Amino acid sequence: MVELTWMTGGKQGSGIDVALGLFSRLMMKFGYNIYGYREYFSNIKGMHSFFTVRVSDKKIASIPSTVDMAVFADTESVLGEKNERGEIVHEGHARDIKKDGLLVVDSKLEKAKIGRNDIKILDIDFDSIISGVAKKFNKPTSDVVIAKNIICVSASAYLLGFDHDAVVEAIKSEFAKKPQSVVDLDVSVSEETVEYLKTRNGELASETINYMKSKGMTPEKILKNGDQGQQIYMEGFASTAIGKAIAGCKMQIYYPITPASDESVFIEEHPELGIRVIQPESELAVLAMTAGANVAGVRASSSTSGPGMSLMAETVTWAGMNEVPLVLVDHQRGAPATGQPTRTEQGDLMFAIHQGHGDFGRIIMAPGDVEESIEMTAEAFNYAERYQLPVIVLGEKAISQGSMNMSKSTVTAIKDRYRVDRGKLVDEVKAPYKRFEFTDDNISPRIKLGNPNAIFWLTGDEHDEWGHVSEEPTNRIKMMDKRNGKYDRILQDLKPEEKFKMVGDVNNAELLAVTWGGPSAAVIEAVEGNNKVAVMQIKLIHPLPKEAVEILKKAKNTVIIEENITAQLKQHIASVTGFVIPNEILKYNGRLVRYDEVSEALTRVMKGENKVILNGY
């Protein structure tokens, strides 16, 4: 079995984010599965960021709390740092390395300060490598220092025994759009790193103790699993963008906000997706334009985060009143207010269910990983048009800033089986046209703007079947029933796998773990091989699947696992069904849920604890 978790980090703006993609693609090239995650502070430059990449020969979508190997070019990443008031900003990552793991540091750092006698520590003279390359290219050192990220990846690959030619290929691929001079410089840095390490082979042999083999990473495994280019490096924010493209979305309208902006930037950088990107003056304008495009018959969407969701509430209610198909992706982050813009949380669930004033139909759905994000985002457009209502896809930073390998065939399969369903969108009607005609299924024929036989009115007021403002009591009752009467059909139409996922044998399990969204992959991995615990991942949050509720009620014992302080899904289930899940595992420190901390927490619940708060970094 191959199992390695790798970490690097440094100051934001120092180029370390390149190391995440470079190391990940290198591991993919040799046939391994990867899952990477990015943690960073909410400023542009100067604060600490770090990246974790897990490498395995099995499919993965989560990471553990500790790492096998860490490579840092700066002291702060290892020892931590304090702000000007003497408060701890972060505690450093020396503590995150497993016993007998490997830490690679700058030679300026005194090993004694690290305080770990149970790990292997190797020092590298980063400055000598950088200055040597700078001299070779006749450049000032300041122009080359950003290439320390190349040293981190190249040193890691060398210590793990990978062929250096593959590293060079990965560098060329990573910087393919850069000038050739940049590529040449980075390749030279990589080569100088290897030459530097070769001069210390005796020390390396004793330090690493054949580290590659200890992780199960052998040349035979590499050759067997080589992917020959059949794997895609998929980042979470790209998955929702690709889902929109598959659905035939033609407009992405957004206002910049972390972490949602990455999705729109990705779309803009990939015109082949066929989606026009527009950035108006405010979040209010964003959703008004999105709703208007959908009224005109164009599949349009927006993506935002919590503060943007708050500003968009009025337009969501307008879309609900006028039965306008609307797809909105909420990449959740730490809240309330500005909160923690670059940290993860699941604090928007109850808000999404009740966003805006009054009662109207809506669908809330939550993918659990990158692959589900593609498929469920695409389906959101079908749901929106089929049932003529707003659909909110609850993403989160835990997914949007995660990255994993995905086979090209998986993406192709999602695209091939996707069928556009525009519901009751018609091309022709006979006058007089009733846009809000009462029907048996509460869904009226809908037509694009511009048809001379289809004159209708859209207002924020209550209206009759033509759209005229109406305050007549009987009409009010019928219209309220119409807008809110679509849930039974939604629950009937959707397949079980679209609503929730079960893992394990719930009939024989002692505990059923209920979760949603970002923590799902970690929870599922945490119970692998444990027949005492089954997992229910709820994908369709609202309306709540009736079949899932029946399973919950029959389980011997249940626990909710969420990334918020109030167990919002638990609240939702209780308010709809009256069933109260008795146990909670919650994490709300802004950090990713790790599978090993879930495993430990489940053990504590099974021993009688009914509430466990996770605080892993």
Predicted regions and their residues:
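Flexible, low-complexity linker and terminal segments
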Residues: G226, Y233-F237, E385-Y617
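Anionic-ligand anchoring segments at beta-strand to alpha-helix junctions in alpha/beta enzyme folds, i.e.
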Residues: V2-A70, A247-S282, T304, V514-T515, ...
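Active-site cofactor/cluster-binding pocket
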Residues: M1-A245, K546
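Thiamine diphosphate
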Residues: M1-K11, G21, R25, F30, ...
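Short acidic, glycine/serine/threonine-rich loops at helix termini
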Residues: D17-G21, G46-S49, K82-E84, I114-N117, ...
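Internal gly/pro-rich beta-alpha loop/helix module
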Residues: K120-N149, V153-H164, V168-S190, V194, ...
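Conserved thiamine diphosphate
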Residues: A70-F72, R343-P390, E396, R417-E428, ...
